[in-house]
């Protein structure tokens, strides 16, 4: 948290015109399957499901406080899960698409271990689309936090099937105990779409 505060203060002291913060949809509470999309205003009352979400929410508040004082213009993007070339694919910090691609590629017996039961739902955005969303937000007059993601939602089980099909391999997932995070991620992209943003990549590509 101190890193964010120090960078924001340094930017304000340097008289920057516009400050961009990469936040996260982890600022939101956990969701149940079938629940309506959360809008940006639904981040409050605050109840992030982990410390990372709280850290991002505090960073948003720090940026907003300087913006209210007229120190700079703020642009805050809440990223959904991002994937693409050069992304982390080993070590336990990789996103689900990269982890499953690696596991399927390395499988020699037609099985892979996957945490949970496969019912958790996520949305993933390709890095090029994410960058385009950021560009549109930064160039706009929107100063409120803005979700950037896609409307393509997939369960972990469906993602396993998609990766297996793309690899042309018959894979049987072995569901094992492990951290799965929140059950569902379902967020409104109306605000970023009002700026003309539309993802061009889907998971199959």
List each model region and its residues.
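Conserved Rossmann-fold NAD(P)-dependent oxidoreductase catalytic core, especially the SDR/UDP-sugar
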Residues: 5-51, 75
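C-terminal substrate-binding subdomain of Rossmann-fold SDR/epimerase-dehydratase oxidoreductases
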Residues: 106-205
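Active-site pre-Tyr helix/loop in NAD(P)-dependent dehydrogenases
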Residues: 24-25, 41-44, 51, 79-86, ...
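NAD(P)-dependent short-chain dehydrogenase/reductase
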Residues: 31-37, 64-138, 161-165
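Hydrophobic positions on the long internal alpha-helix
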Residues: 3, 7-11, 62-63, 133, ...
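Active-site YXXXK catalytic motif of short-chain dehydrogenase/reductase
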Residues: 52, 56
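Conserved cofactor-binding/catalytic machinery of classical short-chain dehydrogenase/reductase
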Residues: 2-6, 18, 44, 58-59, ...
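Structural element of the ATP-grasp superfamily
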Residues: 7, 63, 100, 192-193
């Amino acid at each position: 948290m101190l890193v964010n505060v120090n960078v924001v203060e340094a930017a304000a002291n340097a008289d920057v015109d516009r400050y961009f913060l990469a936040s996260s949809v982890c600022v939101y509470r956990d969701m149940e399957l079938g629940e309506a999309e959360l809008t940006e205003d639904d981040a409050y009352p605050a109840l992030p499901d982990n410390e990372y979400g709280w850290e991002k929410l505090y960073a948003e508040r720090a940026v907003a406080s300087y913006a209210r004082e007229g120190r700079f213009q703020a642009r805050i993007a809440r990223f959904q899960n991002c994937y693409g070339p050069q992304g982390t694919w080993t070590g336990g910090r990789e996103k689900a698409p990269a982890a499953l691609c690696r596991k399927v590629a390395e499988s020699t017996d037609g099985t892979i271990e996957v945490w949970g039961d496969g019912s958790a739902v996520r949305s993933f955005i390709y890095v090029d689309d994410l960058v385009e969303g950021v560009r549109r937000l930064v160039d706009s007059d929107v100063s409120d936090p803005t979700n950037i993601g896609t409307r393509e939602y997939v369960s972990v089980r469906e993602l396993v099937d998609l990766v297996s099909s793309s690899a042309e391999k018959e894979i049987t997932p072995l569901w094992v105990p492990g951290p799965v995070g929140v059950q569902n991620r379902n967020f409104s992209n109306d605000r970023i779409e009002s700026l003309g943003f539309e993802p061009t990549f889907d998971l199959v590509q």
